[in-house]
UniProtKB/Swiss-Prot annotation:
Keyword set, alphabetical order: Cell cycle, Cell division, Cytoplasm, Septation
Top-level taxon of the source organism: Bacteria
GO CC terms of this entry: cytoplasm
Segments for region (Disordered): 32-104
The protein's name in its UniProt record: Cell division protein SepF
Family: Belongs to the SepF family.
Cell location: Cytoplasm
Ranges of compositional bias, category Acidic residues: 64-73
InterPro entries: Cell_div_SepF, Cell_div_SepF/SepF-rel, SepF-like_sf
PANTHER family in the cross-refs: CELL DIVISION PROTEIN SEPF
Gene3D superfamilies xrefs: SepF-like protein
UniProt subunit comment: Homodimer. Interacts with FtsZ.
Amino acid sequence: MSALHKLKAYFGMVPADEIDEVYDDEVAYRDRYADPDTSYDAPSDRVGGRRRVAGGVRGGFQPEAEEDGGDYGEEFREPARSRRQWAPPETPVRAPLGSDAHREQVSRLRAVTDTGSHFNLSKITTLHPRSYSEARTIGEQYRDGTPVIMNLTEMDEADAKRLVDFAAGLAFALRGSIEKVTNRVFLLSPPNVDVAAEDKRRLAEGAFFNYG
């Protein structure tokens, strides 16, 4: 069949029986000149390495599990993280305010306070020095832990001032205290003795001065 006749058959310009003849000629030509190693497969339903979803594209193309080497059919689960057991910090247990420990502490504080406020005034040594040479006696009494009252009314101004300086240094060295009770009368208290204000007032009145 000539090429012109085939062109007419392509545009429907020949009878129907001649069209079948044209088709048979094409099949015979293909069988004659086709490569025996060439195989014509049916069109694949894969596009770009992806499988087309039946019934149209829904949500795009879905990758095949075989190509990626993974199985998307199984649900991916993140491995469970180990949870550290929380423990409350160790705190010391405090006794309530009404416990015996609190009462014992308050009792101790009161005992110390009472000891200082009710100091026995009869244990206080009262000295009436007439010269600076009697400073040694004052130092020995105070060093033994005895409160000392210095009555400097019988001393001249210069010696009285020197004796006050000596007593102040003595109290500082032994971590005690020196206080002025009244004019030219001083009280030297050891570090473990606290004379109450009422007792100081009585000392100032001269009730416990020993002139013997």
